[in-house]
């Protein structure tokens, strides 16, 4: 009789564990579903909507920024490197603002550059766009060529604070 009683307690305990695990799985699936339902494309007001991508995609509290190149009004990279960097970062800032975020919400930045000797020119301008000392994780990688003569292409991920 005691053996049956112990088996029933174990079976009951296993049942409770399985029910609890199932509830957490349902909760996790609901959270993912809720985040996906809040997904929206971000477009700058002057965006070329003929291009097959968005300036960014906001999914829940996370913004994925498409690769950007610092092009002037003529659609080309400016002659001055500092101007190209500022145009690029101003565009990134504008995409973030469309999503209700700031540069300080960036958590990851990838910069492709056609001339790695420009690293030291890029950094002080880049740093000036942040108000926090806690900068995002970043990589600065070489690229053989970028579209429209650009020297830099930046893509990033931001998470709302």
Residue spans of the language-model regions?
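N-terminal presequence-like segments and the immediate start of the first folded domain
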Residues: 6, 11-90, 94-99, 104-107, ...
């Amino acid at each position: 009789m005691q053996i049956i009683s112990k088996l029933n307690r174990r079976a009951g305990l296993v049942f409770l564990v399985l029910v609890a695990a199932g509830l957490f799985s349902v909760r996790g699936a609901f959270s993912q579903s809720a985040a996906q339902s809040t997904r929206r494309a971000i477009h700058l007001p002057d965006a070329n909507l003929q291009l097959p991508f968005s300036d960014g995609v906001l999914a829940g509290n996370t913004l994925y920024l498409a690769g950007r190149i610092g092009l002037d009004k003529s659609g080309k990279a400016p002659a001055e490197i500092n101007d190209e960097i500022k145009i690029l970062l101003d565009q990134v800032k504008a995409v973030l603002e469309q999503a209700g975020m700031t540069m300080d919400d960036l958590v990851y930045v990838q910069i492709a550059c056609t001339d790695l000797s420009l690293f030291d020119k890029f950094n002080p301008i880049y740093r000036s766009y942040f108000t926090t000392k806690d900068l995002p994780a970043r990589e600065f990688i070489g690229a053989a060529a970028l579209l429209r003569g650009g020297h830099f292409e930046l893509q990033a991920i931001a998470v709302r604070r």
